[in-house]
Amino acid sequence: MTLPVNPADNLAALIRCPSVTPAEGGALTALEKMLKLMGFSANRPVFSDDNTPDIENLYARKSGNGPHLMFAGHTDVVPPGDEKDWKHPPFAAAIEDGVMYGRGAVDMKGGIACFVAAVARHIEKHGNIKGSISFLITGDEEGPAVNGTVKLLEWAKQRGESWDASIVGEPTNPNALGDMIKIGRRGSLSGTITVHGVQGHAAYPHLAENPVRGIVTLVDSLLYPAFDEGTANFQASNLEVTTIDVGNKATNVIPNKATASFNIRFNDTWTAESLQAEIISRLERAARDNRLRQGRETPIKYELTWRERPSHVFLTHDEKLIGTLTASVEAVTGKRPELSTSGGTSDARFIKDYCPVVEFGLTGQTMHMVDERVALADLEGLTQIYERFIADFFG
């Protein structure tokens, strides 16, 4: 029996599955075959929710006596866009000059392929693992993330599963393999402000109520002053206005409504609840500011709607997990990785409620881009890092 020890072969098999979210595309089936060659038992639960597509997931475990390590990730990928723009077809896994091209090469089928190869090499060299390893893999990370990791974790917990540590194989390195381990993530909170006015002729503003003046005032209150200056482990919280809409194409008509959406990435100065309270307080004060409203005395009429569920800030403190992975990266690459909390959210935000979690994978320079690609040397390097980590983690 040949074990899946070659990360490039593993990745090619996964890339050739067109698993554009929410489609499974054969990717979980291909992964399940690899894992069963190593003696893993596997389950493929499907989760549903209102107004979202049904999503297939995979949970596989190889049990032993000792700690339980979870590898987590996703096989769904973003659309490739116009395939004519690609140097090689996005689902062909073509190799040119030591580089493999394909959608998901780094985000994050490459990480999965390397961890599979690392486990296979460990088994080939040492036989049984001194503990348990599980793969918790979803097909709903690039989509709404409703029927994926968050439900798969609860499903597994209800069946008696628990974990001592987890690695998420997202592409964490900005420039080169070994640059960065993610040990936490900022929180994320989104909302929409709607200001109601009175439509009218632009030449007769006294007969109308321009909501644009109100939305500008409210948005300004969220942009300044800064929410904080950052903390020891996190950069400063940052709010970005992502849309401003009035639904009005006429230049001589005052609109009757204006909306603005925003997203804020926040640090451990705040909880989602305390940040919501701060935003509400700022808006309430700003609603009484009539400097842009031509002397009107009534407060700005507005509504605030919170969008989706917030992602909570977290920081992992597990010394064994972080120390073992750091030493493994340094041993293979010769450099000590930065421990970082930068970047966006990931499914680690769900896992942190079940066990300590870190993120480490390939280099993310081409993720979501045309000609997404990975150097075969990086696949081998990441596999060696994972293999060393597995050996040291289980002692």
From Swiss-Prot:
Residues annotated to bind Zn(2+) 2: D107, E142, H368
Keywords: Amino-acid biosynthesis, Cobalt, Diaminopimelate biosynthesis, Hydrolase, Lysine biosynthesis, Metal-binding, Zinc
Binding-site positions, Zn(2+) 1: H74, D107, E170
Active site: D76, E141
Swiss-Prot/TrEMBL catalytic activity: N-succinyl-(2S,6S)-2,6-diaminopimelate + H2O = (2S,6S)-2,6-diaminopimelate + succinate
Biological pathway: Amino-acid biosynthesis; L-lysine biosynthesis via DAP pathway; LL-2,6-diaminopimelate from (S)-tetrahydrodipicolinate (succinylase route): step 3/3
One Gene Ontology term from the biological process aspect of the record: diaminopimelate biosynthetic process
Domain of life: Bacteria
Keyword Transmembrane helix included in the entry's annotation: no
Cofactor(s) in the UniProt record: Zn(2+); Co(2+)
Record-listed E.C. numbers: 3.5.1.18
Pfam family of the protein (one): Peptidase_M20
Top EC class, one word: hydrolase
Cofactor note: Binds 2 Zn(2+) or Co(2+) ions per subunit.
Single GO MF descriptor: zinc ion binding
Function comment: Catalyzes the hydrolysis of N-succinyl-L,L-diaminopimelic acid (SDAP), forming succinate and LL-2,6-diaminopimelate (DAP), an intermediate involved in the bacterial biosynthesis of lysine and meso-diaminopimelic acid, an essential component of bacterial cell walls.
Family to which this protein belongs: Belongs to the peptidase M20A family. DapE subfamily.
Quaternary organization: Homodimer.
Protein name according to UniProt: Succinyl-diaminopimelate desuccinylase
Species this chain originates from: Brucella canis (strain ATCC 23365 / NCTC 10854 / RM-666)
Phylogenetic placement of the source organism: Bacteria, Pseudomonadati, Pseudomonadota, Alphaproteobacteria, Hyphomicrobiales
